Amino acid sequence: MNGYDLYISMDSNIQQYCEQAAEKAYIKKQADEVSVIVMNPQNGEIMAMVNYPEFNLNEPFTLIEEMGADGTESADKKQELLNRMWRNPCISDTYEPGSTFKIITLAI
């Protein structure tokens, strides 16, 4: 059975730059989290998407330090922290970029 082709629009150079910028902003501003999306305004393609802090995909059940875990959490609390860690704020949070995005759109 023939399958369908999958084409991605991610640009590895833009992705790497966004990851570095997100980490830098996280540290400099002492933010709780940083999310970045770079999108092509002509067609809506996502060129980069970053959430920081990020977790190790090879160890998805190990809580990252930034989650505030100290190893004494109850099972329910640990599950809550894991769900929060796995969540992708770029696509699941209801906050919209709003006016901060208009500047970028205007520049294009």
Tell where the protein language model's regions lie, with residue ranges.
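Short beta->alpha transition motifs characteristic of CBS
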Residues: 48-54
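Active-site loop and adjoining helix of the penicillin-binding protein/serine DD-peptidase-beta-lactamase fold
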Residues: 2-42, 61-108
